[in-house]
Amino acid sequence: MSATHDPQTVARWSVGGGFLEALANRNFEALAGTLAPGVRFRAMLPPGPMDWEGADTVSDVFGSWFGQADDFELIDATVGEVGGRLHLSWRLRVRPAPFDIGDGWHVIEQQAYANAGDTIESLDLLCSGFHAEQRSA
């Protein structure tokens, strides 16, 4: 099956890939560069809903979650589209987890939907929270 993509779709997918690449490299300055200056970021987190605005503020939020880990691994990431909205997902392993959760490996998965063109204008995220990694025997 083949598909043709209009320039807007290509731009959305490109900025989504840039966001994930910046996250994977923990390059929060580059991550901010994928965001519109007035980006709105709404997140459903384990403690409850949160809302932030502005590219630097949003980048700082991601830095607070992932920037301090000694060990950081991107396990999986995807870029897609749902009804004209960009869909991004990623699963990470970090050690230690932030917020004094624990020193061992923790896994986190996040799903995000974005309105995007050349930059991400709004980002709605659902977060699994940080969970101690369970190794099978």
Where are the language model's segments positioned?
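Short, low-complexity N-terminal intrinsically disordered segments enriched in polar/charged residues
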Residues: 1-33, 37, 137
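Acidic/proline-rich low-complexity IDRs
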Residues: 19-22, 30, 34, 44, ...
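Soluble or luminal CAZymes and related metallo-dependent hydrolases
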Residues: 11, 15, 57, 105
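Short hydrophobic/aromatic segments of transmembrane alpha-helices and their interfaces
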Residues: 23, 40-41, 104
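Compositionally biased, low-complexity repeat tracts
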Residues: 12-14, 50, 100
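A solvent-exposed, acidic/Ser-Thr-rich amphipathic alpha-helical stretch
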Residues: 30, 34-83
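A beta-strand edge to alpha-helix "cap/lid" segment located at domain peripheries
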Residues: 2-7, 60-137
